[in-house]
Amino acid sequence: MSSFGALSRVAACSARSRSVVGRLAAQPHRQWRGIATKQVNEKLPLAGIRVLDMTRVLAGPTCTQILGDLGAEIIKVEHPTRGDDTRSWGPPDLAYTDGVERSFPGESAYYLSVNRNKKSIGLSFNNPEGIAILHKLAQKCDVLVENYLPGSLKKYQLDYETISKINPSLVYASVTGYGQTGPYSDRAGYDVMVEAEMGLMHITGERDRPPVKVGVAVTDISTGMYTAIGVLAALYSRRDTGLGQWIDASLSDCQVAGLANIASSVLVTGKKDSGRWGTAHATVVPYRAYKTKDTNIAVGGCNDKLYGILCRKLGKPEWITDERFITNALRVKHREVLDAMVEAELQLRTTQEWLEIFEGSGMPYAAVNDIQGTVNHEHVLARNMIEEVAHPACGKVKLVNHPVKYSRIEPKIRTPPPLLGQHTDEVLKELLGFEEGEISGLREKKTVA
């Protein structure tokens, strides 16, 4: 509930606060309360760490992008002609502007979302030469992240057992749908299937409607985040042991962990969950999105004090002492009646009018914004969450920035998402010592691109 409140307060900037936010936005290095001003030239914490990224789509690339944001060198291995699967997951695509003919219509928005701060090499490991190159890269790297089906890399001698002998200090992270063990371990796992299998879809959607998936692939994203944390922990452990280890991260496990209080409620009571609640809360009322005169607004009368504020701002102070609504338990009991009353009042004014009425009240509230409204939101922009960078083939592109702010470092978009094979020559020459003629020969054999 606290996260909803925090997000609500963030989203509720009204016209009166815009000038303040604008002034803050003009001071990107403003001193934090109680903390020295950021020294933005300090080295990023993962500078000097090299990651061999053998992942594609979303969960694995989310992990490696986080590591890249924090300063690691990410070498992304892609199929020499197809590249990452998401390169073809357009439209929308960012059109090429450099006049070079390519097999793609542009760089897909999907691919652009999770591949900044990486180098791309086009490399096939369907032949011994490609495998040998990957072995050499593994020797030079601190971390390897892959997201292939369990056991499928063994025939290429790229499994953990083989790679750990080549480089015992390497942290090897495997991201799969259902993990390396268990009865479902051989299943392919995409986000939607795991949302369905592991309970999330069942609790998502309107009360009397069929289950729906979450609007963004949260299981993939949370798995990428958990895997990044696992990699950091393994690197920290390596400082004492000198040894890497195998990280087994699965969408299924991370999704179960993400059920949080809902899973805990079932474990504590031994009873079935309470099902889908739409934007409402199973045990707190009023706490949901309601219709206004023009769009929708979310409000949180999450305790007696906040409920009282809501009643007064709605012009209905008598609801505070209504015997049906005196406590949260009673408000939950009479949910349908109270929700209908609240929505009837909210529909008398526009969302913007309510935002101005609720301003400064201390009650959580937020306009329900679409994505265009979000990426152009005054607070999002003031927090530098959207950054425009120069792409080598597409001109300028806006990307979502790294979300965590630090007092002494500044993770940022150092390089845009790479073109397929953009860094093949650089990596082979500078890191592995290949000569120009050797690389040309590998290209002729379609081992590299």
Where are these regions (language model features)?
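A short glycine-threonine-serine/GTX helix/turn-capping micro-motif
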Residues: 211-222, 244-246, 277-287, 296-298, ...
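N-terminal helix-loop segment corresponding to the beta1-alpha1 unit
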Residues: 2-230, 234-240, 419, 426-449
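A glycine-rich dinucleotide-binding beta-alpha-beta segment and adjacent secondary-structure elements
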Residues: 360-414
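Flexible, small-/acidic-enriched active-site or ligand-binding loops
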Residues: 42, 326, 394-441
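Oxidoreductase and adenylate-handling cofactor-binding alpha/beta cores
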Residues: 224-245, 257-270, 311-318
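Conserved Rossmann-fold dehydrogenase catalytic segment
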Residues: 180, 208-216, 239-255, 271-282, ...
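Glycine-rich beta-alpha junction loops
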Residues: 81, 178-179, 251-256, 294, ...
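Aromatic-enriched alpha-helical interface/lid elements that frame and gate functional surfaces
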Residues: 285-361, 365
